[in-house]
Amino acid sequence: MTHQQMLDLIQQLNDYSYAYHVKDEPIVPDAVYDRDYRQLQSIEAEHPEWIQADSPTQRVGEKPDSGFTNVAHTVPMLSLDNAFDNESLADFDQRIRKLLNAEQVTYCCEPKLDGLAISLRYEEGRLVRGVTRGDGLSGEDITSNIKTIYSVPLKLRTKTPPAVLEVRGEIYMPKEGFEKLNALAVEQGEKTFVNPRNAAAGSLRQLDPKVTAKRPLVMCAYSIGYVEGWEQPESHYAGLLQLSEWGFRTNDLMITAEGAQGCIDYYEKLNEKRASLSYDIDGIVYKVDQIALQNQLGFIARAPRWAIARKFPAQEEMTRILGVDFQVGRTGAITPVARLEPVFVGGVTVSNATLHNKDEIARLGVKVNDFVIVHRAGDVIPKVVQVVIDKRPENATEVVFPEACPVCGSDLEQVEGEAVIRCTGGLVCGAQLKESLKHFVSRKAMDIDGLGDKLIEQLVDQQLVKTPVDIFTLSEKKDTLLSMERMGQKSVEKLLASIEIAKSTQFNRFIYSLGIREVGEATARALTSYFTELDDLMAADQETLVEVEDVGPIVAQHVRLFFDQELNRDTIKGLLAAGVVWEKKQQVSADELPLSGKTYVVTGSLSQFSRDQVKDKLQALGAKVSGSVSAKTDCLVAGEKAGSKLTKAQSLNVPIIDEAGVIALLTEHGAI
């Protein structure tokens, strides 16, 4: 790289930094900044004579914007150096042990929350100031906004507070609050936020505290920055426990770990849990736990020597849109999917990302050949969340939405008030038929083992299956099945046996398998609890349907429309004629069921039953089964490797039972 190219790289990094730290409007993902920053570090190491005074390696951050009063930090809020793999983390541990002449070092390990760093100053136990990190030396006084956040104590919960206490923490927005905030923005025709961090930053820097007060912000303390008139605990971890006693929220996933291997184990464990957490984290912070050792190690130019951050695989990356394809879903929904230059994000290589619908394309202003930000977290489908307008090429072209179904050529329709455009072809459309069949045989529907996606596509393409009824006649086409790809004698026999077993099902699973729009598992269960006879359900008008718990006017309309269609009624008759049956249950009022009004959460690995089976049995006894633990949870069923849900239940004093306990409960009430 030439000297001029390095100067250009410095300018680019400074532009990124200004947008991120000053304007709170990131223009590239953290991973892009980190990659370019490491490149600059490498160049400066080779050519120290090229180092510039304005290089981001020579400073902490940017000067704050002029919208708020500037306040100096008593102790600088420095950045952290980064470890990017196990090897660099082990190198960090080796350096620490060498400097301390120690065989083993204990570290405090904490999730790195993806929010906005702040410093809170308390005098005689009362909050007097809240300041953003800013450039690390000074930040913006946002005290009025900070006071609107309920997780920030206005007064310490102690009769003997320190004379002065400065607490460092992170302001963030939980995922659920972010989704609700964006949904409200869409409803009101306002601009949506790109991600929870962007939403938290924008909310915290409102000039009107009343606006901030309406935003679902949370503050989590992560260190003591400065103290007078109080003897600080000997360890960082003990200090956080003390902050918790004084009324601060701290992260319940923080632990202490021994040596590099303990830190690596924690990283792997938390990386697995990352997607299931209720808030975003982008890595882990490791700190030497003993305060005396921290003081002994001291600081380097821009960071403490005793701490390091390790990032998770990036959940957002920048890439280019090569084109847009249009997929047809089970209910006919036309979904635009961006074809991308392959990019590594969220731990995998991504080459496609959803654009959701026509309205989302317009909202993003996305064009073919645009550079975009792609987001992927856990098992969530990758999506385009932002267009990098500054990098738009001259050959960018508009995305043209099809005027007819791209699969079957049928007309498209858009119901007033809905963003989704749908194909009107129904099961005549090959794409809808394939997706409907995949849903019909899925584990939570008819549960036909051995009938996977690829086999379904082959069966439809060869016109062996045209409706769900045809699945139950496959025994008559055994020779044809044997001639198909990867279908040997044992595979065919196993498939046909599974189809035969699936004929004996449950009423709620049968209704769910039909794929009625807006009818998920819970709604199917509610409908079949209210209507114990299929004929009664099929004949119910909308006024009767809305009497069912959790069934509103829209769901009732879709149920009625489904049963009004002759093709659907013929399919149901065909399935019953093919031998599909279920045990009829006596109608019982929900209030009469033994677990009525109770909320259960099931987590971890179970040996005698699957989690879904336990959930079904609990719901059959009247319980509500939730996917997350809260103060309203009545009981957690915890199997092996229960993880964060168990930790949260323990912190909330939620009753916990193991697999033996839930089996005893189900046995007591005759569910097994």
From Swiss-Prot:
NAD(+) binds at D30, A31, V32, Y33, D34, S79, L80, E110, R133, E170, K287, K311. GO terms for molecular function: DNA binding; DNA ligase (NAD+) activity; metal ion binding. Keywords: DNA damage, DNA repair, DNA replication, Ligase, Magnesium, Manganese, Metal-binding, NAD, Zinc. Zn(2+) binds at C405, C408, C423, C429. InterPro entries: BRCT_dom (IPR001357), BRCT_dom_sf (IPR036420), DisA/LigA_HHH (IPR041663), DNA_ligase (IPR001679), DNA_ligase_AS (IPR018239), DNA_ligase_CS (IPR033136), DNAligase_adenylation (IPR013839), DNAligase_N (IPR013840). Residues 590-672 form the BRCT domain. The active site is at K112 (n6-amp-lysine intermediate). Gene3D superfamilies: 5' to 3' exonuclease, C-terminal subdomain, 6.20.10.30, BRCT domain, DNA ligase/mRNA capping enzyme, Helix hairpin bin, Nucleic acid-binding proteins. PROSITE patterns: BRCT, DNA_LIGASE_N1, DNA_LIGASE_N2. NCBIfam families: dnlj, PRK07956.1. This is DNA ligase.
